[in-house]
């Protein structure tokens, strides 16, 4: 989508158009420095404003390690959704609606770094294990709904045990980063449960341009300074499944991903 008109046309064709999808949708972006809802005329909710300010402060802190995230927030090439509960089935339809809009709109940002941030108001996961279960439960429901309309992105695998796995929604592959208050790692410890969706193709573009390795090295150096050790789940795409990295919880060899794609 390269023009505002084309983006609006895609938004009008959004297949996630049920009453529940509209009720739970919360697609927000900055316009003139003000947070606004972009799929309807309602104002951004108070929680959306608070979550947006908190997330910007979290990522733009000098110690935060992910340089791509910093770039996206500085350039305002991100969208933010504010929802009730991560493990609420009703939220899934609104999240699907907003992710479809983001997949359609992100190409118009003309930036190497774009991201969709889904923040959930209810803090009900007292452990990393509880958050991980809620994360995969929501991704499973999201996929089950999305599979009615879209095939899995053919550039990646739908098998979470495959080193080529990446989560797909609206026909687009995403690397998902989970954040929550109970995270053991500082870089994953945020005030509310949060899922960050980063388009897989932007990493592939960085590789094609020869910039990925240098950026990765800088990020890992910053992570080492912040945490004292790298996340044991870290691996390069194509060597091990990225599914292990989504929740941020260290996983052992016996870990099994609960996600199963429809075929």
Predicted regions and their residues:
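Compact mixed alphabeta submodule
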Residues: 180-221
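Non-heme Fe(II)/2-oxoglutarate
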Residues: 112-117
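Polyanion-binding catalytic cores of nucleic-acid enzymes and NTP/SAM-utilizing transferases
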Residues: 120, 129-133
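Aromatic/basic-lined ligand-recognition segments
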Residues: 154-191
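Conserved beta-strand segments of the P-loop GTPase G domain that flank and frequently precede/overlap
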Residues: 118-121, 198
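Non-catalytic accessory regions used for complex assembly or targeting
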Residues: 1-111, 123, 134-152, 207-263
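Active-site ExK catalytic segment of metal-dependent nucleases
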Residues: 81, 138, 177-179, 196-198
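Short acidic, S/G/P-rich loop/turn micro-motifs used as interaction or catalytic elements
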Residues: 123-127, 182-183
């Amino acid at each position: 989508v390269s023009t505002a008109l084309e983006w609006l046309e895609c938004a009008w064709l959004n297949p996630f158009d049920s009453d529940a999808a509209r009720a739970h949708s919360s697609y927000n972006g900055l316009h003139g420095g003000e947070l606004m809802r972009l799929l309807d005329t309602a104002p951004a909710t108070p929680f959306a404003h608070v979550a947006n300010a908190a997330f910007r402060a979290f990522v733009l802190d000098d110690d935060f390690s992910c340089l791509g995230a910093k770039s996206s927030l500085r350039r305002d090439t991100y969208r933010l959704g504010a929802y009730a509960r991560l493990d609420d089935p009703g939220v899934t339809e609104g999240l699907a609606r907003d992710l479809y809009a983001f997949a359609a709109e992100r190409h118009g940002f003309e930036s190497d770094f774009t991201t969709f941030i889904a923040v959930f108001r209810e803090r009900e996961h007292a452990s990393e294990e509880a958050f991980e279960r809620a994360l995969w439960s929501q991704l499973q429901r999201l996929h089950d709904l999305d599979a009615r309309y879209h095939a899995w992105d053919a550039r990646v695998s739908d098998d979470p045990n495959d080193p080529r796995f990446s989560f797909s929604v609206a026909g687009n592959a995403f690397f998902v980063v989970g954040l929550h208050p109970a995270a053991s790692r500082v870089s994953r410890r945020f005030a509310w449960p949060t899922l960050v969706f980063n388009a897989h193709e932007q990493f592939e573009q960085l590789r094609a341009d020869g910039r990925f390795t240098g950026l990765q090295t800088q990020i890992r150096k910053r992570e080492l300074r912040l945490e004292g050790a790298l996340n044991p789940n870290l691996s390069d795409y194509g060597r091990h499944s990225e599914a292990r990295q989504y929740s941020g919880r260290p996983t052992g060899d016996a870990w099994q991903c609960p996600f199963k794609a429809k075929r």
